[in-house]
């Protein structure tokens, strides 16, 4: 099969799971082409693949730990490319894919529909209108239009893939709200993780060890400072902080001896596997990675980001970790760290999800789905 994979470039989690799927499809002998932009395109190319530049779709901005929704809308409109649609149509006509897999990239989804190509949409949120609640009147109007738009798209896609555990273990379940007539299109693949647990070697981290995966947006810097202060309260707990491309670790001031700060790390899996707890925002893909490696989570969702807050709430409710906020003081953060490290109930639950992730094998499951539903038509 020839498969076009479109990737939303806001948030590297979309890219990570598409790379997991692309690797599986390539290993099975299929021809694929990635379409991406921004950090997403850079990560695809750093991994060793080529990526076709596609128009940007959404641009997120924020400050002091909070997502600036109005600013994000303005930034998105300013960066919008008027000829984006024709460019995508040209790309699809030249590549002639048998199927388009779109990870939350709706411009590419629409282009595929125009050309009457099969479309498999990967999403971990369907209730995007929640993003716009309790905002100013113009933003609320955008929310209503958004709901109508997504409803039309969902009805026209061939399949909606949820890259999460099936119910009752679905972490993104609070972000899903589909009409009953769409339930037949839903496919819970299991987590799309780039590496299998058994294929990753552990690294020697001084125990107990907490790994922070907060990165990507400069407005998350307050968490770094909170974690550094937390580390000073108990030198017996060790930390590795992976900063991400938008943060400058040199501006963080004094670093305790029990803390190691690393710049952007391409392969975080050895760190996750070797840790006793992971500090992360509420992003879906990062949570999937931690759970697939059997590690409890301390989640700091971006304030005002309803999708992340909902994911973190499920982590808290199900006992996979704790939900914290940017206002949580270091003393409380430390107690939460001690709790998830010392209480075996957390470890037992996440180890169950680690086993389940391996059994589901999300990338392989989607490959088989495409081969069954598209492969026969393509051959």
Curated annotation (Swiss-Prot):
Transmembrane segments: none annotated. It is an enzyme of class 2 (transferase). GO terms for molecular function: glycosyltransferase activity; hexosyltransferase activity. InterPro entries: Glyco_trans_28_C. Its EC number is 2.4.-.-. It holds the Pfam family Glyco_trans_1_3. Keywords: Glycosyltransferase, Transferase. Belongs to the glycosyltransferase 28 family. This is Uncharacterized glycosyltransferase MA_0452. It comes from Methanosarcina acetivorans (strain ATCC 35395 / DSM 2834 / JCM 12185 / C2A).
């Amino acid at each position: 099969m020839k498969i076009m994979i479109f990737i939303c470039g806001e948030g590297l989690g979309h890219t990570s799971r598409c790379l997991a799927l692309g690797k599986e499809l390539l290993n099975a002998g299929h021809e694929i082409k990635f379409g991406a932009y921004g950090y997403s395109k850079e990560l695809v190319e750093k991994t060793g693949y080529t990526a076709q530049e596609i128009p940007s779709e959404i641009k997120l901005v924020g400050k002091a730990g909070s997502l600036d929704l109005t600013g994000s809308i303005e930034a998105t409109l300013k960066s919008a490319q008027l000829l984006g649609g024709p460019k995508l149509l040209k790309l699809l006509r030249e590549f002639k894919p048998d199927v388009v897999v779109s990870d939350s990239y709706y411009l590419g989804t629409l282009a595929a529909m125009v050309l009457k190509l099969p479309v498999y949409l990967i999403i971990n949120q369907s209730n995007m209108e929640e993003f716009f609640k309790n905002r100013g009147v113009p933003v609320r109007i955008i929310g209503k239009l958004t709901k109508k738009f997504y409803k039309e798209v969902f009805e026209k896609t061939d399949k909606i893939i949820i890259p999460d555990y099936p119910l009752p273990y679905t972490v993104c379940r609070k972000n899903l709200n589909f009409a009953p007539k769409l339930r037949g299109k839903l496919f819970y693949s299991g987590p799309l993780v780039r590496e299998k647990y058994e294929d990753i070697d552990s690294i020697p981290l001084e125990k107990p060890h907490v790994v922070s995966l907060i990165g990507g947006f400069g407005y998350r810097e307050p968490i770094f400072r909170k974690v550094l202060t937390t580390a000073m309260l108990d030198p017996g707990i060790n930390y590795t902080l992976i900063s991400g491309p938008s943060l400058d670790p040199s501006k963080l001031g004094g670093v305790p001896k029990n803390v190691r700060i690393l710049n952007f790390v391409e392969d975080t899996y050895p760190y996750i596997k070797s840790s006793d707890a992971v500090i992360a925002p509420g992003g879906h893909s990062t949570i999937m990675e931690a759970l697939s490696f059997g590690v409890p989570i301390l989640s700091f969702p971006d304030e005002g980001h309803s999708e992340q807050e909902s994911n973190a709430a499920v982590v808290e409710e199900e006992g996979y970790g704790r939900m914290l906020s940017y206002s949580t003081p270091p003393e409380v953060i430390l107690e939460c760290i001690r709790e998830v490290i010392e209480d075996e109930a957390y470890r037992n639950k996440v180890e169950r999800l680690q086993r389940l992730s391996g059994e589901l094998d999300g990338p392989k499951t989607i490959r088989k789905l495409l081969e069954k539903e598209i492969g026969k038509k393509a051959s």
